[in-house]
Amino acid sequence: MFLLREVHMLQILHQSLAKSIPESLKVYGSIFHIIRGNPFKLEVLVDSWPDYQNVITRPQKEEMTDDMDPYTNTYHIFTKTPDKLPEILESSKVINWDQIFHIQGCQQGLDEKIKSVAASKSVQIDYSKRFLYTTEAIQQLKSSNKKMIEKFHETATQNTRKFKSEVDNRKPTLLDVSHSELVNDNWKFGKNEKSLRYIKRCIQNFPGYCLLDSKGNPISWNVMEATCELRMAYTLPEYQGKGMLQEMMNAYMKYLQEKNLPYFLHVEDMNENSHKAVRRLGFHAMPCDWHEWKSTPKRFQQLPHF
């Protein structure tokens, strides 16, 4: 694997990965932001060029200084040759197995291959599979048409649905970094200093969205990550069941479409209310699903998990 640095090569790779949506969404979304300023300081590895078979995005080495920060230490993968993936992942030049880290992807059939490498490294692997949701507009990015983004914008705008919540005097707007603690305190996978730092970084660099109450406080929100995935969606308990999330997401999707930003999300298997909500917004579940592996070296296995 070697680094792909030239902007025009990254643009070619990005266009090529669009043809493999939804399986390529994690790396596709990462590269989308890399070629637009790279605020998270990520880098792209391929096994060959231009006929690549494997793509990995990861933080630059100087970003991965905290061995116990899996929010930062995250790798996104896409492979056309799953059988060759173990050989790639076992290389210390590709993956730092001495850290706690995440691997994320949107392809079936990689669990056994990743776990086989993990066994050889004597690390603990925690695997999660969830439903991957995209809109019809994202699926149309698979087109090789040069006006791909314009088509995405037109289709997405047509598919936007209107919702009105049951609460008056609310205002849809972008999240501010001052809202980070509120988001962190209500994120199932957050509630710690490392996640707070990560959330602040996301809100500072990518458009998050919320509904404000009459006093200007967020009551429903969502955050965009470096892969263009929308995560951390939440509505305060006293406002749940009143259409808040629907209205916020409708405004958020409209904003992203106006900015020509692709987006997707995932939902946990048992969260039936969220499944219904995203379907009403025009999202469709993808057969490939959303996958995450958390790797923990032996020296950290007795410590509290995040």
Describe each PLM feature range.
Residues 82-91, 241-257, 276, 280:
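Conserved acetyl-CoA-binding loop-helix of GNAT-fold acetyltransferases
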Residues 230, 263-267:
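Conserved hydrophobic beta-strand within the GNAT/NAT acetyltransferase core sheet
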